[in-house]
Curated annotation (Swiss-Prot):
GO terms for molecular function: rRNA binding; structural constituent of ribosome. GO terms for biological process: translation. Pfam families: Ribosomal_S13. It is found in: Cytoplasm. It comes from Dictyostelium discoideum (Social amoeba). Located at the top of the head of the 40S subunit, it contacts several helices of the 18S rRNA. One of its GO terms (cellular component) is small ribosomal subunit. SUPFAM superfamilies: S13-like H2TH domain. Keywords: Cytoplasm, Ribonucleoprotein, Ribosomal protein, RNA-binding, rRNA-binding. This is Small ribosomal subunit protein uS13. Belongs to the universal ribosomal protein uS13 family.
Length: 154
Protein backbone atom coordinates (compact mmCIF):
# COMPACT_ATOMS: atom_id res chain seq x y z
CA UNK A 1 0.00 0.00 0.00
CA UNK A 2 1.40 3.39 -0.96
CA UNK A 3 1.74 6.07 1.65
CA UNK A 4 0.24 9.49 0.98
CA UNK A 5 2.85 11.23 3.14
CA UNK A 6 5.83 10.43 0.94
CA UNK A 7 5.27 10.89 -2.78
CA UNK A 8 7.90 10.66 -5.47
CA UNK A 9 7.00 12.33 -8.74
CA UNK A 10 5.07 15.34 -9.98
CA UNK A 11 2.40 16.72 -7.68
CA UNK A 12 -0.25 18.92 -9.27
CA UNK A 13 -1.99 21.37 -6.95
CA UNK A 14 -4.81 22.01 -9.42
CA UNK A 15 -6.21 19.50 -11.93
CA UNK A 16 -8.65 20.39 -14.71
CA UNK A 17 -11.49 17.89 -15.04
CA UNK A 18 -14.60 18.86 -17.04
CA UNK A 19 -13.64 22.55 -17.12
CA UNK A 20 -13.49 22.55 -13.33
CA UNK A 21 -10.49 23.24 -11.11
CA UNK A 22 -10.06 20.25 -8.81
CA UNK A 23 -7.95 20.76 -5.68
CA UNK A 24 -4.95 18.42 -5.83
CA UNK A 25 -4.45 18.38 -2.05
CA UNK A 26 -7.79 16.70 -1.36
CA UNK A 27 -8.32 12.95 -1.52
CA UNK A 28 -9.51 11.90 -4.96
CA UNK A 29 -12.92 10.71 -3.79
CA UNK A 30 -13.76 14.12 -2.32
CA UNK A 31 -11.87 16.16 -4.90
CA UNK A 32 -14.10 14.80 -7.69
CA UNK A 33 -17.16 16.25 -5.96
CA UNK A 34 -16.01 19.71 -7.14
CA UNK A 35 -17.30 18.71 -10.58
CA UNK A 36 -20.99 19.52 -10.96
CA UNK A 37 -23.02 16.31 -11.19
CA UNK A 38 -20.55 14.19 -9.19
CA UNK A 39 -21.46 13.41 -5.61
CA UNK A 40 -19.54 11.43 -3.01
CA UNK A 41 -21.14 8.10 -3.88
CA UNK A 42 -20.67 8.51 -7.63
CA UNK A 43 -17.05 9.61 -7.08
CA UNK A 44 -16.41 6.55 -4.91
CA UNK A 45 -17.92 4.24 -7.51
CA UNK A 46 -15.93 5.81 -10.35
CA UNK A 47 -12.69 5.44 -8.37
CA UNK A 48 -13.44 1.77 -7.73
CA UNK A 49 -14.25 1.11 -11.39
CA UNK A 50 -11.00 2.85 -12.44
CA UNK A 51 -8.96 0.83 -9.88
CA UNK A 52 -7.69 3.97 -8.15
CA UNK A 53 -6.88 3.96 -4.45
CA UNK A 54 -9.37 6.28 -2.73
CA UNK A 55 -6.78 7.31 -0.13
CA UNK A 56 -4.64 8.89 -2.88
CA UNK A 57 -4.54 12.65 -3.24
CA UNK A 58 -5.88 14.11 -6.47
CA UNK A 59 -2.53 15.72 -7.27
CA UNK A 60 -0.79 12.34 -7.20
CA UNK A 61 -2.79 10.94 -10.11
CA UNK A 62 -1.05 10.29 -13.39
CA UNK A 63 -2.43 11.48 -16.72
CA UNK A 64 -3.51 7.91 -17.49
CA UNK A 65 -5.52 7.65 -14.26
CA UNK A 66 -7.23 11.00 -14.88
CA UNK A 67 -8.07 9.82 -18.40
CA UNK A 68 -9.59 6.60 -17.00
CA UNK A 69 -11.71 8.60 -14.55
CA UNK A 70 -13.05 10.90 -17.26
CA UNK A 71 -13.90 8.03 -19.63
CA UNK A 72 -15.83 6.23 -16.89
CA UNK A 73 -17.64 9.44 -15.98
CA UNK A 74 -18.45 10.02 -19.67
CA UNK A 75 -19.79 6.52 -20.32
CA UNK A 76 -20.96 5.01 -17.01
CA UNK A 77 -23.28 2.45 -18.63
CA UNK A 78 -20.33 0.79 -20.41
CA UNK A 79 -18.67 0.18 -17.04
CA UNK A 80 -21.71 -1.57 -15.51
CA UNK A 81 -22.83 1.35 -13.36
CA UNK A 82 -26.55 0.73 -12.70
CA UNK A 83 -29.16 2.95 -14.32
CA UNK A 84 -30.63 4.06 -10.99
CA UNK A 85 -27.27 5.67 -10.18
CA UNK A 86 -27.44 8.05 -13.14
CA UNK A 87 -28.86 11.57 -12.86
CA UNK A 88 -30.70 11.61 -16.22
CA UNK A 89 -33.03 8.61 -16.52
CA UNK A 90 -35.39 8.01 -19.45
CA UNK A 91 -34.69 11.31 -21.18
CA UNK A 92 -37.92 12.84 -22.51
CA UNK A 93 -36.49 13.32 -26.02
CA UNK A 94 -34.64 10.09 -26.75
CA UNK A 95 -35.57 7.84 -23.80
CA UNK A 96 -31.92 7.12 -22.96
CA UNK A 97 -30.24 6.82 -19.60
CA UNK A 98 -27.24 9.11 -19.17
CA UNK A 99 -25.21 10.94 -16.56
CA UNK A 100 -24.90 14.70 -17.10
CA UNK A 101 -21.81 16.49 -15.84
CA UNK A 102 -20.67 20.12 -15.54
CA UNK A 103 -22.21 22.29 -18.28
CA UNK A 104 -24.49 19.51 -19.54
CA UNK A 105 -26.57 19.76 -16.36
CA UNK A 106 -27.28 23.46 -16.90
CA UNK A 107 -28.16 22.93 -20.56
CA UNK A 108 -30.53 20.02 -19.85
CA UNK A 109 -32.18 21.89 -16.97
CA UNK A 110 -32.76 24.94 -19.17
CA UNK A 111 -34.19 22.72 -21.95
CA UNK A 112 -36.58 21.07 -19.48
CA UNK A 113 -37.83 24.43 -18.21
CA UNK A 114 -38.29 25.73 -21.76
CA UNK A 115 -40.28 22.61 -22.65
CA UNK A 116 -42.52 23.05 -19.59
CA UNK A 117 -43.11 26.70 -20.48
CA UNK A 118 -43.82 25.86 -24.12
CA UNK A 119 -46.47 23.24 -23.34
CA UNK A 120 -47.97 25.57 -20.70
CA UNK A 121 -47.65 23.03 -17.90
CA UNK A 122 -48.46 24.27 -14.39
CA UNK A 123 -44.80 24.08 -13.35
CA UNK A 124 -43.75 25.95 -16.48
CA UNK A 125 -46.24 28.76 -15.89
CA UNK A 126 -45.07 29.14 -12.26
CA UNK A 127 -41.45 29.26 -13.45
CA UNK A 128 -42.37 31.84 -16.07
CA UNK A 129 -43.91 34.19 -13.50
CA UNK A 130 -41.13 33.60 -10.95
CA UNK A 131 -43.46 32.07 -8.37
CA UNK A 132 -42.95 29.10 -6.06
CA UNK A 133 -43.27 25.84 -7.97
CA UNK A 134 -43.50 23.07 -5.39
CA UNK A 135 -46.74 23.93 -3.62
CA UNK A 136 -45.43 26.31 -0.99
CA UNK A 137 -47.67 29.00 0.46
CA UNK A 138 -47.20 32.44 -1.09
CA UNK A 139 -49.57 34.64 0.92
CA UNK A 140 -46.95 36.16 3.20
CA UNK A 141 -43.56 34.86 2.06
CA UNK A 142 -41.72 35.28 -1.21
CA UNK A 143 -42.89 38.83 -1.78
CA UNK A 144 -40.82 41.06 -4.01
CA UNK A 145 -40.97 44.67 -5.09
CA UNK A 146 -41.65 47.76 -3.02
CA UNK A 147 -42.27 47.37 0.68
CA UNK A 148 -45.49 48.90 1.89
CA UNK A 149 -45.27 50.25 5.43
CA UNK A 150 -47.98 49.92 8.03
CA UNK A 151 -50.17 53.02 8.36
CA UNK A 152 -49.58 54.56 11.79
CA UNK A 153 -52.20 56.07 14.11
CA UNK A 154 -53.17 59.63 13.40
Amino acid sequence: MSSSLVFQGEFQHIIRIYNTNVDGRRKIQYALTCVKGVGRRFANLVCKKADIDTSKRAGELSKDEVERLTTIMNHPRQYNIPTWFLNRQKDIKDGKYSHCLANQIDVKFREDLERLKKIRAHRGVRHHFGLRVRGQKTKTTGRRGRTVGVAGRR
